[in-house]
């Protein structure tokens, strides 16, 4: 089996369908004997340039190990699913399991925001 990195972008109006799509695609990979090494839902993000007059899209990243037939099936599903506006399937040399820079940045942003709120709360409590 080969390793692949898969990124697909979903129309922002169809964001509520993303969990079902992820479940369907991961199910197809695992039932055929493949494994999912990394799955990240990056959420709705700004596009670098408009695609079909859209400025935002819902991003999903997957690193998988699967047979070529399953990847062909996924590619066909992406092509005929109107909610998927772009996709990229890239073969990699090895399994990637560490957290992506996108997810790290999002995590750091949330922890920094939580730390600032805690500091403000302790300052407000000490002033009283």
Swiss-Prot record:
Pfam families: Ribosomal_S6. Residues 104-121 have a biased composition (Basic and acidic residues). One of its GO terms (cellular component) is cytosolic small ribosomal subunit. Keywords: Ribonucleoprotein, Ribosomal protein, RNA-binding, rRNA-binding. GO terms for molecular function: small ribosomal subunit rRNA binding; structural constituent of ribosome. It comes from the Bacteria. GO terms for biological process: translation. PANTHER family: MITOCHONDRIAL 28S RIBOSOMAL PROTEIN S6, SMALL RIBOSOMAL SUBUNIT PROTEIN BS6M. Binds together with bS18 to 16S ribosomal RNA. This is Small ribosomal subunit protein bS6. It comes from Aeromonas hydrophila subsp. hydrophila (strain ATCC 7966 / DSM 30187 / BCRC 13018 / CCUG 14551 / JCM 1027 / KCTC 2358 / NCIMB 9240 / NCTC 8049). The lineage of its organism: Bacteria, Pseudomonadati, Pseudomonadota, Gammaproteobacteria, Aeromonadales.
């Amino acid at each position: 089996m080969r390793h692949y990195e898969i990124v697909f972008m979903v129309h922002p109006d169809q964001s509520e369908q993303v969990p079902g799509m992820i479940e369907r695609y991961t199910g197809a990979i695992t039932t055929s004997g493949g494994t999912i090494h990394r799955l990240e839902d990056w959420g709705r993000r700004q596009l670098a340039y408009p695609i079909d007059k859209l400025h935002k899209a819902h991003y999903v990243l997957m690193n998988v190990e699967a047979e070529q037939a399953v990847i062909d099936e996924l590619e066909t599903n992406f092509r005929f699913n109107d909610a998927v506006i772009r996709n990229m399937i890239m073969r990699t040399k090895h399994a990637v399991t560490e957290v992506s820079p996108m997810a790290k940045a999002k995590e750091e942003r949330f922890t920094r925001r939580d730390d600032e709120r805690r500091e403000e709360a302790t300052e407000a409590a000490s002033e009283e």
